[in-house]
């Protein structure tokens, strides 16, 4: 497997719609950077956030997820409480080629403030908006800026195509249009 360079990412985005909307350069003036980088793509976070709130003393069960465990906020600046967790989605829609798997890493600017951004791999053949998981490990509130960079996606090309891709197994998170809560089917 090899990490794919900027020119490969740009070609796939423009010719095959791998990333849409696609920013073909690194935008960084006065914002948390986003767009194309040397060996990845820095994606933006949308303005709709779901912040965990223990208002009902619920237990989080991934098989029976309590929908009322979140407070929904739509804002350009979301203030994450200390030691909290929230979900959001990318501004960009991704279409992953069948010979590629994508991993996500956080941005150093947020990491230095105590924010960890986590995403499970984007499987070959998957498409949709990516649900982002934010953890505030800091003992203080931290601002998260909508429409600015939140994480970097690294595209790893396999030596050959996989036998069964995510779209072929009707994956439960295929074509998700917004923040998607856990699904156990």
From Swiss-Prot:
SUPFAM superfamilies: dUTPase-like (SSF51283). The keyword Hydrolase applies. One of its GO terms (biological process) is dUMP biosynthetic process. Gene3D superfamilies: 2.70.40.10. Pathway: Pyrimidine metabolism; dUMP biosynthesis; dUMP from dCTP (dUTP route): step 1/2. It catalyses: dCTP + H2O + H(+) = dUTP + NH4(+). The active site is at residue 133. GO terms for molecular function: dCTP deaminase activity; nucleotide binding. Coiled coil: none annotated. DCTP binds at residues 107-112, 131-133, 152, 166, 176. Its EC number is 3.5.4.13. It holds the Pfam family DCD. Belongs to the dCTP deaminase family. Homotrimer. PANTHER family: DCTP DEAMINASE. This is dCTP deaminase. The lineage of its organism: Bacteria, Pseudomonadati, Pseudomonadota, Alphaproteobacteria, Rickettsiales.
């Amino acid at each position: 497997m090899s990490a794919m360079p900027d020119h490969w990412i740009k070609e796939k985005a423009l010719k095959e719609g791998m990333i849409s909307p696609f920013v073909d350069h690194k935008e960084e003036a006065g914002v948390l950077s986003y767009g194309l980088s040397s060996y990845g793509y820095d994606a933006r976070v949308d303005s709709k956030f779901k912040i965990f709130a223990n208002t009902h003393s619920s237990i989080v069960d991934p098989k029976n997820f309590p929908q009322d465990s979140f407070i929904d906020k739509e804002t350009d600046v979301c203030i994450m409480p200390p030691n909290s967790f929230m979900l959001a989605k990318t501004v960009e829609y991704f279409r992953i080629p069948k010979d590629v798997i994508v991993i996500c890493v956080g941005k150093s600017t947020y990491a230095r403030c105590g924010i960890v951004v986590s995403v499970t791999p984007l499987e070959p053949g998957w498409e949709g908006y990516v649900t982002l998981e934010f953890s505030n490990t800091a003992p203080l509130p931290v601002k998260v800026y909508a429409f600015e960079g939140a994480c970097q996606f690294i595209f790893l090309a396999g030596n050959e195509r996989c036998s069964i891709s995510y779209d072929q197994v009707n994956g439960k998170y295929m074509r998700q249009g917004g923040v998607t809560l856990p699904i156990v089917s």
